[in-house]
Structure formats: C-alpha cells, structure tokens
C-alpha cells in the first residue's frame, strides 16, 4: 500500500486505552489491535457482516469505502477530516519517540501479511463496552475476528480490516504532519522528503519568528539555519503552556516581539527575551566588525574558532572552572539590571554575563556572519538545566567538534552521545505533555546515613587503641586516600566517608564491639585537643604559630581593607602585625584562614614580603611579616619631593621588582592570583626594593570594594572584569600592574578626580582608561596600554613584562651623586 509522494513507514495509531481491550486467544496469540472505527459503526448496515478477502493480487474493497480508484485518495469526511477523530484523541497518547505512543505496530504485535491467499478476514463487531476479541478459529492459518453482537439485539456494524488499517494510516499521517509542522515551523510542504536539497536550504529565507519558534520549542538550530535579524530567544515561558492557553490563530505559535516589549518586567521577573538586532544594537555591530577582523587575520578554521570562542567567553563573564553555577548569581544580577532599562526584551550585545545558552547563541550568530558551519544542540557539559545549549562546529564534511565556551574557551571536545543522540534530532512538539521530573524529598536520607556512619566510625577511631594519633587518624585516612574514592564522594556533595564505610558488615560490627574493650586513650579534659586544621596544615609544633602574648604591639603604621597594621617587637626583632578586622569567624572560615597562612608560609622570594608566622587563635587572628621601614609604595610616590628622590631608573627598577614578585606567584603550582594588587599593597625596604604583600588574603575578603573604608580597597587599580564582578584570572593582576606602572611613570594618583562609584562606571562599564602623557617614553606607554587591553587573554604575562622592562632599565642613566638614603 504505497502512497505516491508520501512516506509509507508510519505506524498505526491506537485510540483506545489498554484497559478497554480484551483478547481471547486460541493457539498462538497475536497481540492487541485497537480499532479506530468504533465511532463510525452507525455508518454501516446494522446486523450485516461485511467481508473482504485478501487475495495474492489485492483486496476486494467494501462498498462503503467508495468507488473505484485508489482507496487512500477517497474524500470521506468521516475519516481524517471528521472532528470526532480529533476530539477523541487525547494528548496523553503522544510520545517523543514516534508520532504516537503505544502504536499497534510497536511491541510484540505481528501484523498479518496482505499476501496470505487463504486467510479470510471477517468483519469486526463492537459490543457496548467498545471492546473486541481476537481469536483463531478453524484450522490452518485462518484469522477470524469474532463479532460480539449487541446483547439487546441492537445494530452492529462492521468494517474490513483493510479499511481500519487505511483509516489509521490516514489519521496518523495527518497528525504526524501537524505535529511536525508545529514543532519545526516548516514552510516547505515537502519537508518530509528523505533527501533535502542543501542549496535550497541555504537560499530559502526563514522569518525571524519562524526560527525563533523552532529554537524555542526544540532548543536546536542546524547548520543550515541562519539566525536572521530580529531573532529572539525566549526563556521563562513554557511552549506547552503557551499552546494550551492561547488561540494559535490569534496570538501565533510564539509571543510576538511587540507583545513582549509591552510586558512589564516587574510582573514576571523570570520572563526574558534576548534579541539579535543589528540595527539598534551598537555593541553587536562592534562584535560584527571584530568577527570580520578575526576571520581575516586567522589562517585555519581552528584558529577562527579559538579566537571567536575566547571573544564570546570574555565578553560574557569569562571562564568558570567549577561549573556554570558560578555564573548564575552574576547572571541574575546582570539581567535584573538590564530589565530596568530594556524591560523584557534585551539586546544580545548588552549582555556582560551569559550562561551557556546565551554564549551558544552568540557564537552561532557570529559564526553565520563569516560562514563558519555551526549548529546548536541541547545539553551542556557544565550544567544540567533543561535549557542548556552547546555549539558544534563542522570541520570538513565528516567531522564536528564541540566548542567549549564556558570552562576552557576555544577547546574542541569530541561530541558525546548526549549531543549526537536521538534527543538532539527528535521532534519535540509543544503539544506534548512535559516530561515529569522526580520529586526530591526535603530530607536527603542518603546524606543522613553517610553522616551517621561517619560519626559512628569517628568514635571508633578516637577510642581505638591502634590509633597512635589520638583521634586524628580518621582525618589523615580521609585526605590521604591514594585511591581517590573519597574524592568522588566529596564532589557529589556528600562529603568524605571514612574508610570503614566501605567495610563489610561483619568488620563494621567488629569495630563497633571494640569500643567496650578498648582502653580510654582520649586526652584528659584539662588538656586541649590539638586543632585539626593546625595538624593538617603543619602549623603546630613549629615557630609559625605565634602566641599573641609574645608580640609587643607598638604604633599603628597602616590600615587596609582587612584590618590594621602595627609595628611590633617579637623576640627582639621588628615585625609588622596585621590584625584582621573580622574576628568572628566560623570554624570553616578559620580553616580557610589557616590554609592561606600555609600558602604564605611556603613562599620564598626577594620580592615577596617574608611571612614569619600567624596568630591563629581568635580574637587575635593576625599575620606577622617582616617589617619594611619605608612603608608602602603608594605613600612613597605621592609624598612631596618624590620626583627628586625617585629618578626614572629607580622607578623602572621598582616596576621590575613588582613584575618579578608577581611572576613568581603566577608560576607557582597552583598559581597564586593576587586579586588586590595596588601600590598600597607594595612595601619598600631601606634599599628601595619593592616587595609584594597581602596576596594570600584576597579570598577571605567578604565585602565588596564599595564598602571599604580605606584607600586600600578602592577600585582605581582593579581590572574591568573585576569591577563588573565577573570571573577573573591572573590577567587581572596584569591590568593592576599597568596602573602601578602608570603611577610610577607619572607620579600621579590614579583617578584622583573621581570617587569610587565613578571609577567603577568609567572603567568597568564605559571602557575608560587613564590618560597617558604624550611626553612619556613610548616603550613604557606601550607596556601600559598592553596591560590595559579590555580582553584579558591579550594582556602580556609578567615574564614578558620583565623582558620589556630589562632593556629600559639598562638604557636609563642614573643621575650623579645619587645616594640610597
């Protein structure tokens, strides 16, 4: 039964639910077959049984099926076009895997062959409960569908099996066409053709609303989908809800951009629409031009992809290492601010932070400009949200790679099964019921169980005579696990389990029974239990843990965003003591403080302030370092007579000292990012050697720069991405060094005519930079400008800066009779 111009591999549609079907089988049972003609039984003669014989050459059609010609082309209003069929079809029968779920061709049903010459198919009768029975009667291969007469002697009707099959086929074909059209917004009536014309797909324009609806429903765009001007990506409104609540003929398949612009952003904060509009989006025009420059400057496709991915990543919040959850708070803050300006419809060029779906869309739009083959698929390796999206780029004719836009911008990954599997190509109809999600209980009993076994085993270890560390062997076993099994548990949020959690039950029982027989080796009550963090970090037992009583605090010599700095005497030596302003730390914060102290303890470099120890007991948490007599570089540069005291060569040497110290920090494993590099955090000794300090405390800083009460926390030295509260890396320190070099070259205070809020607006959001004097050494000016590049990845490293400064220092001639006072 082939239909010209249409596919023939559609499955039959099942109308009735499973509990309406009763099967009586003799011999080898065929599975259920659901009839679709129960509502039309009144159209046939009651009490007569219509018969059709299946011969090898074809069928003898029932007269009610119409006259001659192709039976499938008969125009019968009681088949496909009748409203009774549409009304009787529940949406709950739909499935994403095929046109309709539970098809009569799915499962184990074996359809009788049409070429069986001797099979006689009798008509179907319907009892009052709309059920029917299948049975084998007689001998041989005869399949008889027994008719159940009406118990009241009423009328019964019958249709041949072929008519029912044809009716099912036509109805399901119509529904499949409708659902596919709704899901894909296909304007081409031949979109079901197996081999589409690629040239036609490239040249046929699609309206912005059509492509927007396709992406809204499917979350995917193919290589041949060009994102037109006026395209908008909606979020916060479910397509299924929209389809149920509105009239498609009046309101359209997707909310129009005009109706979205009329929505008050305060009514529904979750609704957003990111629009691609080249005419009214100047920031996007700038991106358009930059993409052309990238395309012209790069030789290979891989270089283009790499540069384009880094451009998008840096523009939309930078890379994140631990997952996209780091971007969510910044994204909410960004979109809330933009909604106050643009309401619900936000231009894509105005986004300073973007999630994976925004980055994928921008990559697709810019890739289309330079004809880079790119498609958007559902799913992301950095998040598990339903609206997650990723970009894949095609290399040649048979290779495609996933472009990383979140964690490692520009890196090419092999696409996994989630992106190339059935979910990426299946039609997702808005008429389909949303897939229910499992409801998580309010109490996670698995975590409670882990905590229970962890607590129980900790008791075993504390009172275990074999434990020669009196209660701390548990922690060493946890953190020194060579197998890495506990690390996987910790990543899942469940914490680390003690090794005994993996014991067989009998071993666990034996360990618990030892509590009664074990001697009590716990320390006496009067003896303080050693601090777990101190033991873990190695601070106890050496001179790094300084008792507060050993310090003789003297005059105050400075203040910072973390506290006050005092000169003190410790065992006859001058030291600097930085007393932390925030002393009310929780145990977790104290441990974090101790970890930072441990990092500082391991640093040894002539341009790093020497760490001497720490006071680790609240309320006197303090950092003890070497004392540098000349104070901060900021004070030295901005006092009277600085130009006479600090000649050009000395100032360049000071810049070189800062670069050496920062290069040492950035080349540590793992790298140490200062995050608060500025002239007040640079100290000068009596020989004018500059040393970096305060690099280990930036992670403890809970307040923002605007809440700081001293000049040490002002944003004059901060990089634009830091001012925008975006993720940053070591290149933010390079920007800060550029401000310090400008400070050394001009002996001026950066942004002295602006308050902190104005600096944030000028540098972070208006891309303003300090003015470089025209009479400044061009080579020094070039270094400063390189450090101030808006894209962090374009800024030089400190090793490169050292190479650039070294010849400048040699060429600068010191003035005669200079003395290092």
From Swiss-Prot:
Tissue specificity of this protein: Expressed in both seedlings and adult plants.
Catalytic residues in the record: 676
Keyword ATP-binding among record annotations: yes
Reactions accelerated catalytically: L-seryl-[protein] + ATP = O-phospho-L-seryl-[protein] + ADP + H(+); L-threonyl-[protein] + ATP = O-phospho-L-threonyl-[protein] + ADP + H(+)
Top-rank taxon, per record: Eukaryota
BP GO annotations: ethylene-activated signaling pathway; gibberellin biosynthetic process; negative regulation of ethylene-activated signaling pathway; protein autophosphorylation; regulation of post-embryonic root development; regulation of stem cell division; regulation of timing of transition from vegetative to reproductive phase; response to ethylene
Pfam family, one: PK_Tyr_Ser-Thr
Coiled coil: none
Residue ranges occupied by any Protein kinase domain in the UniProt entry: 551-809
Enzyme Commission number(s): 2.7.11.1
Class of the enzyme per the UniProt entry, highest EC level: transferase
Recorded GO MF terms: ATP binding; protein serine kinase activity; protein serine/threonine kinase activity; protein serine/threonine/tyrosine kinase activity
PROSITE patterns: PROTEIN_KINASE_ATP, PROTEIN_KINASE_DOM, PROTEIN_KINASE_ST
One GO CC term on file: endoplasmic reticulum membrane
Listed Low complexity bias regions: 14-25
Amino acids binding ATP: 557-565, 578
InterPro entries the record matches: EDR1/CTR1/ARMC3-like_pept-like, Kinase-like_dom_sf, Prot_kinase_dom, Protein_kinase_ATP_BS, Ser-Thr/Tyr_kinase_cat_dom, Ser/Thr_kinase_AS, Ser/Thr_Kinases-Pseudokinases
Record note on disruption phenotype: Mutants display ethylene-treated phenotypes, resulting in plants with small, unexpanded leaves and whose seed cotyledon growth is impaired.
Activity regulation text: Kinase activity is inhibited by C24:1-ceramide during hypoxia (e.g. submergences).
Residue ranges of the region described as Disordered: 1-76, 481-502
Compositional bias per record (Polar residues), positions renumbered to this chain: 35-49
Family: Belongs to the protein kinase superfamily. TKL Ser/Thr protein kinase family. RAF subfamily.
Described function: Acts as a negative regulator in the ethylene response pathway. Phosphorylates the cytosolic C-terminal domain of EIN2, preventing the signaling in the absence of ethylene. Interacts with C24:1-ceramide upon hypoxic conditions (e.g. submergences) to in turn regulate EIN2 endoplasmic reticulum (ER)-to-nucleus translocation and EIN3 stabilization.
Assembly with partners or alone: Interacts with EIN2 (via C-terminus).
Name assigned to this protein: Serine/threonine-protein kinase CTR1
Gene responsible for this protein: CTR1
